[in-house]
Structure formats: C-alpha cells, structure tokens
Curated annotation (Swiss-Prot):
This is Fibroblast growth factor 18. The lineage of its organism: Eukaryota, Metazoa, Chordata, Craniata, Vertebrata. It comes from Rattus norvegicus. Keywords: Disulfide bond, Glycoprotein, Growth factor, Secreted, Signal. The keyword Glycoprotein applies. Residues 1-27 form the signal peptide. Residues 164-174 have a biased composition (Basic and acidic residues). Interacts with FGFR3 and FGFR4. One of its GO terms (molecular function) is fibroblast growth factor receptor binding. CDD domains: beta-trefoil_FGF18 (cd23324).
Length: 207
C-alpha cells in the first residue's frame, strides 16, 4: 500500500525548495547588479562633478607619446612635446574619459571605421573612451561606442584601426606621465595619521 509521506519528509522538501528559491534570487540580483554597473559605465553622467587632468600618454610600443596634431593622431611625441600634452576629462564614475590636445584643442576620437582622428567638437560618443587599468599597470583605452576597439599604435607611432586591436596587445598599452617640468602635479595622496585620543581630564573644583 501507498504510505503518506511523514511530516519530517515534508519539512525537508520545503526546506530544500526554499534554499533553491534563495539561490535563484541571489543569482538574479548578481546579474542585475552586473548589468547595472555596465550600463552606468557606458552612460554619461551629467550630475557628478567632472575632473580635468593634464598628462601625457606614453605608448609601450612606439616608446613615444600620443600627439593630437589637429585632425591627425600619432604616437611620436617626445617627453614635454606641446602636442603630447593632453587634457583628460573624466566623464563618469565608470572611468569614461574624453581626451583633448592642449595645444590644438582637438579631441581624440575613433570613427566608425576604427580610425583615430582629431575632432574640434568632442561631444560625440566617438570621442569617449573607457579607461581600463590592466594587471601590468598599463592603461588601455576602449571606445565607448565601438566595444572591443582600442586606441593603439604601431612601433613607428602610426595609429592602428580599432578592429585590429585587442586588450592584451602591447600596441594598446599606455603609461600616464606628467609633462616635463610639471612634476608638481604628480602629488601622492597623503594619509593623515590618527593617534589614539587621549582621555580628557576634567578639572576638579573645590566644593
């Protein structure tokens, strides 16, 4: 004969079902949070305070610095070259940046063919890049509009087209350097040492 399940068996089944539901909810929350972060990384933020920094980008491949020569882009600039001084505006908390040549006031952009070009107006999404700090301490710049396309240069300092670049290629690796003679801008963050607060002794008053 068929025997009804015991109360203990029912409780165990309910417990297992509850654990499964909790795991499903946790997985959904993790996916939703990851999607939220990715969306925020790609979305421009007009509320947060933008930061403007001045530095050079040293190309690991060419051994020189990125230059914004008007509409033409290269990586042949010497240390301190006026065309290699870049004004970098942080666009969002997700490390989106816009890069402008200080001398020419043209923006570094990547067009739909993956070619690096300079533009006088940097409001287009083609002029926004996602800054990635790599494990080797180099920085890579991926196009915010064309995912997977990176700013890259050959050994001769010529721009590489976006579709031919990958994050692990040395061609897309850069090192931030402050302009020659302006080392005072490179100030390390200073930590304040907090000492243990001494106990306050109250003065005694005669009764």
């Amino acid at each position: 004969m068929y025997s009804a399940p015991s109360a203990c068996t029912c409780l165990c089944l309910h417990f297992l079902l509850l654990c499964f539901q909790v795991q499903v909810l946790a997985a959904e929350e993790n996916v939703d949070f990851r999607i939220h972060v990715e969306n925020q990384t790609r979305a421009r933020d007009d509320v947060s305070r933008k930061q403007l920094r001045l530095y050079q980008l040293y190309s690991r491949t060419s051994g020189k610095h990125i230059q914004v020569l008007g509409r033409r882009i290269s990586a042949r600039g010497e240390d301190g070259d006026k065309y290699a001084q870049l004004l970098v505006e942080t666009d969002t908390f997700g490390s989106q940046v816009r890069i402008k040549g200080k001398e020419t006031e043209f923006y570094l952009c990547m067009n739909r063919k993956g070619k690096l070009v300079g533009k006088p107006d940097g409001t287009s999404k083609e002029c926004v890049f996602i800054e990635k700090v790599l494990e080797n301490n180099y920085t890579a710049l991926m196009s915010a509009k064309y995912s997977g396309w990176y700013v890259g240069f050959t050994k001769k300092g010529r721009p590489r087209k976006g579709p031919k670049t990958r994050e692990n290629q040395q061609d897309v690796h850069f090192m931030k350097r402050y302009p020659k003679g302006q080392t005072e801008l490179q100030k390390p963050f200073k930590y304040t040492t907090v000492t243990k607060r001494s106990r306050r002794i109250r003065p005694t008053h005669p009764g």
